[in-house]
Amino acid sequence: MSEQKAFSLKIDEQNIAWLAIDVPNEKMNTLQAAFADEMKEIFAQLKDTSGVKGMVIHSLKPDNFVAGADVRMLEACTTASEAEALAKQGQELFQQLSDLPYPVVAAIHGPCLGGGLELALACDYRVCTDSDKTRLGLPEVQLGLLPGSGGTQRLPRLIGLLPSLDLILTGKQLRAKKAKKLGVVDACVPETVLLDIAKMHVEKGKKKGKQKQSTKEKLMSGSGLGRKFVFEQAAKKTNEKTRGNYPATVAILEVIQHGLEKGFAQGQELEAKRFGELVMSSESKALRSIFFATTEMKKENGAEAEPTAVNKVGVLGGGLMGAGISHVSVAKAKVPVRIKDVSNDGVLNALNYNYKLFEKQRKRRIISKAGLQSKMLQLSGGIDFTSFNHIDVVIEAVFEDLDLKQAMVADIEANAKPETIFATNTSSLPIHKIAEKAERPENIVGLHYFSPVEKMPLVEVIPHETTSEETISTVVALAKKQGKTPIVVKDKAGFYVNRILAPYMNEAAHILLANEPIEQLDGALLDFGFPVGPITLLDEVGVDIGAKIMPILVNELGERFKGPDVFDTLLNDGRKGRKTGKGFYTYKGKKKEVDKSVYKLLNLTPESKLSDNDIALRCVLPMLNEAVRCLDDGIIRSPRDGDIGAIFGIGFPPFLGGPFCYMDQFGLKELVEKMNEFASKYGDRYAPCDGLLTRAGEGRNFYD
């Protein structure tokens, strides 16, 4: 029996070639270096076949075209030149495709991303289905890379400079209709006629000529002055977002500009060279490690048992968290939701919140008006427990009050099925205390979402000692269907994310009270790579929330969690943060500025004394120390979970790979030295924990 191949070629009776892609034993088609020989054989076969009128490239997978290059092959590269050779191989194969003397059409259904889109761009025409599964894009930048098989050169020549920069610099994915509007594809059709329409493009018998440039495009990319202006502005805007932490964006701008100025061939040459360099960069290695980790986690149940089916979800509480949880349950998990609140106003609030989110999608043409109505019909609510006897999982999102949450457990046990799971969205209360009076404690688990629920990708799954394996695996499966990345953590104060966040925030408060200006403090952590600074974060989360959580951590975990006592002063002055329009900043619409009166309130005279690097390290090192304690205490199951939790839960800089990956890069011996230096200057709170000292002494890394 011959070995199954990824590419197969057939010539039909009308002399049209059909190149089918079907990577053996894989759910998704990905491009691999090993396929190069197959492609060379196919080109040789096409060359030896006379009378071919054209070719259609299509996938035999039911729901994807080509999801990109197989990222795993980059891990085998030990030098930049090896990675550069991979890029050149892809460029050469796609150039051969582009040089065929007859029209070639890509028939696209499902994801067409990265190398998949680069393959399609090398064709004369692209036809895609109007399915919601169809997505087109070049997401390489999200892995710290650039498109390495001609994408940086072909896309700007196809759709123009500005839209290409937007797509390649962000890695955003286009839906089918948007791709048609931008000119990425030539037709957007129902799936049933995809191959017929692709064949029609071949039957036209013409290769696609050079794209005609609009006057605007000629001014922007065709003239030296216009091009210079566009790239200067793009570099400025990109640097504002990345703070110089992502070398891939700099390389993307350089390579596209070089190609437009020096020609396609030289553009591809630089593209391959920069691709090779980026593959070996620490930033790309860290981002790829996150990609591999999340891919791995998608396959895990979180427990030994298989999950049970969840056909209906109940949500207790119609506030911000309850509304967000109900939204991801309907929109992503596609299960009907029943909302219960103490008042009809609470239920209406949750329904209105959902309507606004779906209406945004309708305006962006992501869903139709009928689709919006269909989604809203999946939501219902009331002030009693009507229909809760049909619910599989109840997610509680009421106030942080132990008695109230225990009462909710009793209500659900009285009104739902015996096997109904009770998942509590608490951020500070112990799960075992919430389950203390339960008749069926094995059904109770923590499910800690982050706000806003519809945007934040992480959820902490917190079993207590008697939570069943089936309960754990079921809520892990539900969280994944809601579009979340779940990590299973131990039932201890602060769980994982809040526990490592607390010392970071405390240190920011220490630095502020030493008279460092708020702007510099926040700016230093932005430059380090966090999405927001610590003072802004406190305003966003709410000063009142911080005031509730910190004493719990001090009580449960000890004096090292005791920070400067500023909460009462701020709250007595009505400063709860963004939600009240006043915290450390004042807020008017989307604009914010430092409220200078807060300095007087706290008896401060702001003066910049510390370097940005020292500010950042002073905040980050206590977080790293606590992350190690969490690992050694069994709060998290692995360094991988700790890295993903910190990146997705609090925005730890992705290009650093997470706390544990960053510590390995920093060097544990060097880290211990830095902590000891800070401990001598600022106090014992910087003293490295035992786990860090042991590993540093033994020369071990977290990812050995």
From Swiss-Prot:
Listed SUPFAM superfamilies: 6-phosphogluconate dehydrogenase C-terminal domain-like, ClpP/crotonase, NAD(P)-binding Rossmann-fold domains
- Which GO BP terms apply? fatty acid beta-oxidation
Could you name the domain of life of the organism this protein comes from?
Bacteria
Pathway, per UniProt?
Lipid metabolism; fatty acid beta-oxidation
* Marked site: Important for catalytic activity: 118, 140
Q: Where is it mainly found?
A: cytoplasm
Cite the residue spans of the region called Enoyl-CoA hydratase.
1-190
* Reactions catalysed: a (3S)-3-hydroxyacyl-CoA = a (2E)-enoyl-CoA + H2O; a 4-saturated-(3S)-3-hydroxyacyl-CoA = a (3E)-enoyl-CoA + H2O; a (3S)-3-hydroxyacyl-CoA + NAD(+) = a 3-oxoacyl-CoA + NADH + H(+); (3S)-3-hydroxybutanoyl-CoA = (3R)-3-hydroxybutanoyl-CoA
Q: Which UniProt keywords apply?
A: Cytoplasm, Fatty acid metabolism, Isomerase, Lipid degradation, Lipid metabolism, Lyase, Multifunctional enzyme, NAD, Oxidoreductase
Is NAD among the key words of this record?
Answer: yes
Q: Which HAMAP family match?
A: FadJ
Q: Which family does it belong to?
A: In the N-terminal section; belongs to the enoyl-CoA hydratase/isomerase family. In the central section; belongs to the 3-hydroxyacyl-CoA dehydrogenase family.
Known partners and oligomeric status: Heterotetramer of two alpha chains (FadJ) and two beta chains (FadI).
Q: Which NCBIfam families match?
A: FadJ, PRK11154.1
What is the protein name stated in its UniProt record?
Fatty acid oxidation complex subunit alpha
Species source reads Vibrio campbellii (strain ATCC BAA-1116)
